[in-house]
Amino acid sequence: FGPKELLKSLKKASDCLKGGELVCIFAEGQISRIGGQTLAFQKGMELIMRKQDAPIIPVHLDNVWGSIFSFHEKKVYWKVPRQIPYPVTVSYGKSMPTNSSHTEVRREVVALGADAWAQRKGRISTIGRAFVRTARRARTRMAFADSTGKKLSYMRALAAVIVLIKRLRKDWDGQQKVGILIPPSVGGALTNLAGILMGKTVVNLNYTLSEEGIRSCVQQCDIKCVISSEKVIRKLKLDPGVPMLALEDIAKDPSFMEKMSAAFLAYLCPRGILLKKLSQGNPPSLDDIATIIFSSGSTGEPKGAMLSHYNIVSNMMQLNQAYDFKRDDRFLGVLPFFHSLGFTATL
């Protein structure tokens, strides 16, 4: 539209309001091209409401990003929606005075959006369930790779996690919080996923802490053993106060039957049954604690922040919406798993 057409449309909307009609406008003036973020509202709304005697009803549309009506994948309409039917939440706020500014109305709409986000909780999966679902959908796509040359597809990663879970049951028996001291790597990712699918709370210990600081973390979480790697054990020569077990020894030489059993469960076992089997009948809920992230201990003993599955997965969803990742994108993660962003983004 040119300037003349725009003025005509504003006048027509104003005339409709005076005639007692309901006028619905998209105050941003354009479709968001940045992950569905709410853009600045335009002043045209104030021109429409000038000399009117009608309330303003703020309305928020949540979860539209990814539908055919969004600019997801850099195009509108001509794309396949992420799911069918596509869930959208429409929220209505309290009526606002006629003379409300466009910034005040935007503030109310954003507040509605924050409330609407909480409604997504019923549609969000735990970390383990989301990983299994992704592995089943993207079987041959690369899941993990590291600088040692290791590279795993999603289904091979899921099968490896299943084998690892069987091997770790004895070492982690009777523990809810389990300690891991492994740098960002394929092995570290698999160990974390094994703990999460078992329903454990994984505690990635900060290997830059002093021995005293690591012992404090171990004692606070009542950790009975720490899963690490041979290189880390040799290099750091730490004594955390509990046995340190090398992942290489735990995971080495899986038998033919172990591989076949893991492949069967990974490929054919129904997801719900698989999740119950891996967690011994007690799969975690969204509100269960997925990980504990400790501070650096610069102001005393390290302090642990407990993050639930909902904390982690909702942040992952927000990152995905803001950055609009594609199927062929690759994420280079350098932050360690004992860092909150490292656990969320790197893992």
Give the positions of each predicted feature.
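Conserved AMP-binding/adenylate-forming
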Residues: 166-209, 334-336
